[in-house]
Amino acid sequence: MPKTLTEKLNAIKAAGKGIFVPYIMAGDHEKGLDGLGETIHFLEDLGVSAIEVGIPFSDPVADGPVIEEAGLRSLAHGTSTQALVETLKTIETEIPLVIMTYFNPLFQYGVENFVKDLADTAVKGLIIPDLPHEHANFVEPFLADTDIALIPLVSLTTGIERQKELIEGAEGFVYAVAINGVTGKSGNYRADLDKHLAQLHQVADIPVLTGFGVSSQADLERFNAVSDGVIVGSKIVKALHQGEPIQDFIKQAVAYQK
């Protein structure tokens, strides 16, 4: 039986709507982790498809400056993986949450304990950007009997046979990395990006979402046209931190019709 995240996103896709997943950094709030539920419910009320929740880490190799600084602010507020897990247990939401964490915090906590402790929460997906596919066996056995999907990240420079290998048996969605580089680096797109996304669609039987560098209305339109939806991180994180209005951008993303 498909996992909840797969079913939820497939239903949005089947309805002819674009999938929209904002990223937030846990603990990057004036109230620290006490403000996490407030942010999640703010986004839920705007109708987002799912929410990616980042765990702060001192060496975030895939993150650009906006998210790296958010992580440092979160750590300064005293955020820990243990405290985040305890906070997630208290948050009630109908929106699937997807945890984005580097492997080190997960390893320090204990993969099996982490998965068990999140079993009764809204967490339905897990992204580990620095975990090679060849080492997925460090995590996958603990997820097998849970409702948490391990999300594959696929570079659009990856050949089709490798793409098939990366997404075989995957649930939730495929995270298509739109740029070569770190998050938030807008506009540095390959000339053949659309062709690579079309190729990825041919081999994926779950939704394909585009992320890394998606930050403008033009980006939303472009990537919704060639993938099943988008993930937006740096723009959301910056707006929430600086108190900038972000509602209209999110509403436009949520309302996108295929």
From Swiss-Prot:
One GO location term (cellular component): cytosol
Record-annotated active site: E52, D63
Signal peptide feature range: none
Family: Belongs to the TrpA family.
E.C. numbers: 4.2.1.20
Keyword list, A-Z: Amino-acid biosynthesis, Aromatic amino acid biosynthesis, Lyase, Tryptophan biosynthesis
Source taxonomy: Bacteria, Bacillati, Bacillota, Bacilli, Lactobacillales
Molecular functions per Gene Ontology: tryptophan synthase activity
Self-association and partners: Tetramer of two alpha and two beta chains.
Organism of origin: Streptococcus pneumoniae (strain JJA)
Gene3D superfamilies (alphabetical): Aldolase class I
Name of the coding gene: trpA
Descriptive protein name: Tryptophan synthase alpha chain
Top EC category: lyase
Catalytic reactions of this protein: (1S,2R)-1-C-(indol-3-yl)glycerol 3-phosphate + L-serine = D-glyceraldehyde 3-phosphate + L-tryptophan + H2O
Function (record text): The alpha subunit is responsible for the aldol cleavage of indoleglycerol phosphate to indole and glyceraldehyde 3-phosphate.
Metabolic or biological pathway, per its Swiss-Prot or TrEMBL entry: Amino-acid biosynthesis; L-tryptophan biosynthesis; L-tryptophan from chorismate: step 5/5
PROSITE patterns: TRP_SYNTHASE_ALPHA (PS00167)
